[in-house]
Design a protein with these regions (language model features):
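N-terminal presequence-like segments and the immediate start of the first folded domain
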Residues: 1-62, 66-71, 76-79, 85-134
Length: 134
C-alpha cells in the first residue's frame, strides 16, 4: 500500500485546521482549495494578493501550481479543476484570465466546474485540482 504524503510548500502557511494543502498517494495528487493569499511571511497572517479578481485569480493559480510542483506534478498532469467564485458576475472575467493563463498548456484539463459560494471576507475565488501523475 502506498503512503499518503501531505504537501505544504514553503510559500504556504500551515492550514488553520487538520488538513493539508495537498495530498499525494501513489500517482494521485489532490490539491485542496486554494485562495489568493500572497506567499507566507513568518509571524504575519495570510494576506490576499489584492482586491481585484485578476490579482486573486493569478495568485490562486500560483498557489495551486506550488502544491502540484511540491508533489512532483505540473498543470499537464491535472485532470480536473474546480473554481469557486463568490459572484456570478465574475464568471466572464475569470474565464478570460483562466484562458490567458493556460494559453500555452498542451492538453487542457478534462473538466472544469465553476461553483458559486461564500468565502471569507475579501476573497473572491478559490480553486482546487486533481492530478494524476505518470
Amino acid at each position: 500500500m502506498t503512503d499518503k504524503i501531505a504537501l505544504t510548500p514553503k510559500t504556504h502557511t500551515t492550514p488553520p485546521a487538520k488538513f493539508s494543502h495537498g495530498v499525494r498517494k501513489g500517482n494521485i495528487l489532490q490539491v485542496a482549495g486554494q485562495v489568493g493569499f500572497l506567499p507566507a511571511e513568518e509571524g504575519k497572517p495570510p494576506t490576499p494578493a489584492g482586491p481585484t479578481l485578476r490579482e486573486q485569480t493569478l495568485q490562486t493559480l500560483a498557489n495551486v501550481r506550488a502544491i502540484l510542483e511540491e508533489g512532483g506534478a505540473s498543470w499537464e498532469d491535472v485532470m480536473m479543476i474546480r473554481v469557486y467564485l463568490t459572484d456570478v458576475d465574475h464568471f466572464a472575467e475569470m474565464n478570460a484570465i483562466y484562458n490567458e493563463y493556460f494559453e500555452g498548456l498542451v492538453e487542457v484539463p478534462a473538466a472544469r466546474t465553476t461553483v458559486y459560494v461564500g468565502l471569507p471576507a475579501g476573497l473572491l475565488i478559490e480553486i482546487d485540482a486533481l492530478a494524476v501523475l505518470g
